[in-house]
Amino acid sequence: MLDPALLRQHPADLAERLRSTRGFALDTAKLESLESERKHMQVRTQELQSLRNSKSKAIGQAKAKGEDVAALMAEVAGVGDELLHSHGRLTVVQHELEKIYAVIPNLPHADVPLGKSEADNVEQSRWGTPRQFDFPVKDHVELGAPNGWLDGETAVKLSGARFTVLRGPIARLHRALAQFMLDLHVGEHGYEETNVPLLVNADSMRGTGQLPKFEDDLFRIYENEYEGHTDEETGESFYTPTGGVDPDPAYYLIPTSEVPLTNIVRDEIIDAERLPLRMTAHSMCFRAEAGSGGRDTRGMIRQHQFEKVELVTACAPEDSDAEHQRMTRCAEVVLEQLGLPYRKVLLCTGDMGFSAIKTYDLEVWLPSQNTYREISSCSNCGDFQARRMQARWRNPVSGKLELLHTLNGSGTAVGRAMIAVMENYQNADGSIDVPQVLRPYMGGIERIG
């Protein structure tokens, strides 16, 4: 969330910046009208509270003197009614303002190039040279399906579209990749391994910015409503379903472990000595892919359920730029140790995520598509998420509480890494060489198939 003070002080300037960089239309007239009413209702509520307190004090003094207090009590009752109305309206106005604040995207860093789509992203560097094949290249489906290692048909029977069943050596390769990534980030990059829930509450989703804007892309878990009873003989309590369902989701399936990892610092005050906090987790991720249409329907490129190794950092504001470079480099090392050609891209203003001020994407080379595809996205979110979460640290110089900066990145997507390994390490006979760094995780196997 942007600083409400900035929105109050410079609404027109911020509206123009949001329009030109994010394509976001801020209704400044509505914002200023609500802010004016908020100020008025806040002053009026405080005046009424003061008036009620003074009249209540007068009642006590009058009673002590034995005077009739009926008129004063009637006045206090009237003030109380007006206070109730004033406070209620203030609450409504504040809620309306919060709804506006909640859907405003973060402002890009000055280094971020202006643009509307991925076509305007700026390539920063490349690593590795794409392999030249002397035989027809197969995609990951053609490599995995004939042996039953990659089974989309069974997944459709079990669940539906955009799911995959992995078997045998490909399932083992998938697991090996996740283990390799975790070991690298924990053992060499200094991240703390963390095991997080896959189900989180709405506060967690709001904290990292998934709610309210992206609710349609989330899987929601609803709870049945129950009615309480007491056994007349034993006195024990028990519950039976009413047949109804609670209208609000009890939980959300995480779209990325960024959500639970980042929310670990929600409502916390972190000592400066503990910073930076660097955390990593390997988890399932779940996305409805509501806006993906018919894109990437073949194979495992875009799934409802997939696995990812996530990197999250919480740090002091002055360190976030350096931490962003460091995090991105940690993800690059994964691809380099796997021997996968990739390129690093700086996202333009129109292609960045909602919460980010600056994002680097790493795109891995897929021979079957003759192009680079995203495998990691590393973002600096500044204090945007921290303000929503009230995640703070105590500045040892000033002694004051300040908002943390939060960062997140994929280190990397496991399924896409598996696809890249399969395609880049394929042989003419359909077999797949196992990258050197993965062989200890594969029982020494050097080739699949």
UniProtKB/Swiss-Prot annotation:
Pfam family, any one: tRNA-synt_2b
Localization: Cytoplasm
Top EC class, one word: ligase
Xref: PROSITE patterns: AA_TRNA_LIGASE_II
Highest taxon listed in the record's lineage: Bacteria
GO biological process, one term: selenocysteine biosynthetic process
UniProt xrefs under InterPro entries: aa-tRNA-synt_IIb, aa-tRNA-synth_II, aa-tRNA-synth_II/BPL/LPL, Ser-tRNA-ligase_type_1, Ser-tRNA-synth_1_N, SerRS_1_N_sf, SerRS_core, tRNA-bd_arm
EC number per UniProt: 6.1.1.11
GO cellular component: cytoplasm
CDD domains, sorted: SerRS_core
Entry binding sites for L-serine: 256-258, 310, 410
Metabolic or biological pathway: Aminoacyl-tRNA biosynthesis; selenocysteinyl-tRNA(Sec) biosynthesis; L-seryl-tRNA(Sec) from L-serine and tRNA(Sec): step 1/1
Binding-site positions, ATP: 287-289, 374-377
Keywords, in A-Z order: Aminoacyl-tRNA synthetase, ATP-binding, Cytoplasm, Ligase, Nucleotide-binding, Protein biosynthesis
Role noted for this protein: Catalyzes the attachment of serine to tRNA(Ser). Is also able to aminoacylate tRNA(Sec) with serine, to form the misacylated tRNA L-seryl-tRNA(Sec), which will be further converted into selenocysteinyl-tRNA(Sec).
Self-association and partners: Homodimer. The tRNA molecule binds across the dimer.
HAMAP family in the cross-refs: Ser_tRNA_synth_type1 (MF_00176)
Record NCBIfam families: serS
Family, per entry: Belongs to the class-II aminoacyl-tRNA synthetase family. Type-1 seryl-tRNA synthetase subfamily.
Comment text on domains: Consists of two distinct domains, a catalytic core and a N-terminal extension that is involved in tRNA binding.
Protein name, per record: Serine--tRNA ligase
